[in-house]
């Protein structure tokens, strides 16, 4: 990591290229801003390094984190916050970069549940209250779309998805909605 050497990120970029410099920069920022203990930094560096040798090791680590997040309720609140923060900052983005979009979404939602308990609860209640009505309307809409396209000789498959609490919260924040 660059703070432990006389080299800068730019030196690394010139010698090894943008990809390596970008990785070094990310690890350096994480070390400075997020992970305070050497043990944590070493652990995350080992995870990133294992990407080069065997992706299965990273998959096991991400799976383990997902399991830990699903059973986090048994831990003290301070540990919940710490683990949820690590998950949000490291594991969810890593899962996303590896194309594990459903896992990323699960990690984000579980992290959100512990980091923003009130907001998560409000959104979850709102989703459950309107779920039956929304499902019925969405099914009618999809049926109409498929019928109209079929009438015009177009075969299609219409799929739907439900936004999850973290995604809704993030969108609300982006649009400055309470």
Give each language-model segment a name:
Residues 1-177:
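Active-site helical microenvironments for divalent-metal-assisted chemistry
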